[in-house]
């Protein structure tokens, strides 16, 4: 089975959507499936206003239909709600083709962080648009039970679970490489307003605060918090070494639907401190490998007491192969439903 995945998020972007899709393509052949991507690298792109790291695709009339025709997929999945996602959605609807979608990004929360408008206005409008986008989908895939329940309560459906995984061979306990005062509290990810890094950097904590990643908010945060160590973006082995050097991984975001970095930290044997919100609650709630508290400082200090061996053991159970299997099951069900009809 060949599955065409339409996505506006793609390399060289560094985020959870891109990592999830990359691992999906790697694991799918184990189930006799092939993943092909319709991504921005196939089109002319322009930088997104206020966020130039993200490129928006511009497509000539007929370009999407031509690309899909060349791919000749057995099934179509739409991963994002951007220009490519909208174009492929129109293509499928005009031809009566079934498709699945996935919900990766809390745009209502992101826009509330970025637009000088009352949150109730932006949230209501954005949820309405997202609900309309996903309405024709055979299955809307959500990463966690909590997100699934929220989408269902907001009128999305049907909603299915597509769990995430972690590369436990890359992200593993290692000898520390950071020669900084301990304990080391580390945050990894895009340095952008919606990640709420200010809540972490403003904490009165012992030791050292470290930020790994890049983004539009980095210059201002570096000026405001000169005592923190900003290391820029890292990938692969270099990133894995930094995780393993930390004593606590701090995740201050309120807007992430999952947070793959949580699993990467845990696989490295590093406990997590976070707010008790969707994402961290679904991943960490009741596991004993994370400290969740509305007082983030208290969560950070509690996390220092968590057993690192338990963190590693928890993450080892979450594999990308199982994630790919869940995805392909949803796609196959949608395809078979159309055949039966």
Give, region by region, the residue ranges found by the protein language model:
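Aromatic "clamp/platform" in nucleotide-sugar-dependent glycosyltransferases that forms part
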Residues: 254
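Nucleotide-activated donor-binding/catalytic signature segment of Leloir-type glycosyltransferases, i.e.
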Residues: 219-238
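Short hydrophobic beta-strand element within catalytic cores of glycosyltransferases
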Residues: 262, 267, 271-274
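Short alpha-helical donor nucleotide-sugar binding micro-motif in glycosyltransferases
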Residues: 134, 241-246, 327
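Conserved donor-binding/catalytic core segment of Leloir-type glycosyltransferases
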Residues: 141, 177-210
């Amino acid at each position: 089975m060949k599955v065409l995945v339409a996505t506006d998020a793609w390399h060289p972007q560094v985020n959870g959507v891109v990592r999830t899709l990359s691992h999906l393509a790697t694991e799918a052949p184990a189930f006799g499936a092939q993943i092909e991507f319709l991504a921005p690298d196939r089109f002319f792109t322009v930088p997104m206003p206020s966020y130039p790291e993200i490129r928006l695709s511009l497509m000539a009339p007929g370009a999407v239909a031509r690309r899909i025709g060349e791919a000749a997929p057995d099934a179509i999945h739409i991963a994002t709600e951007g220009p490519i996602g909208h174009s492929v959605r129109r293509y499928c609807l005009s031809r009566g083709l079934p498709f699945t979608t996935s919900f990766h990004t809390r745009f209502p929360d992101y826009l509330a962080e970025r637009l000088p408008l009352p949150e109730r206005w932006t949230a209501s409008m954005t949820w309405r648009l997202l609900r309309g986008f996903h309405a024709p989908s055979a299955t809307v895939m959500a990463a966690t039970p909590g997100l699934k329940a929220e989408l269902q309560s907001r009128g999305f459906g049907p909603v299915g679970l597509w769990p995430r995984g972690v590369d436990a061979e890359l992200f593993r306990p290692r000898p520390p490489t950071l020669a900084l005062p301990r304990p080391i509290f580390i945050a990894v990810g895009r340095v952008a307003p919606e990640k709420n890094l200010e809540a972490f950097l403003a904490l009165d904590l012992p030791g050292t605060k470290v930020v790994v990643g890049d983004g539009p908010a980095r210059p201002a945060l570096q000026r405001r918090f000169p005592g923190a160590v900003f290391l820029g973006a890292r990938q692969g082995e270099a990133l894995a070494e930094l995780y393993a050097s930390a004593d606590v991984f701090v995740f201050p975001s309120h807007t992430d639907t999952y947070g793959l970095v949580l699993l990467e930290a845990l696989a490295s044997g590093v406990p997590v401190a976070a707010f008790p919100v969707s994402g961290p609650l679904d991943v960490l709630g009741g596991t004993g490998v994370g400290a969740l508290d509305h007082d983030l400082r208290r969560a950070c200090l509690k996390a220092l007491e968590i057993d690192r061996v338990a963190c590693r053991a928890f993450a080892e159970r979450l594999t990308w192969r199982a994630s790919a299997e869940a995805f392909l099951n949803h796609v196959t069900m949608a395809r078979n439903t159309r055949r039966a009809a």
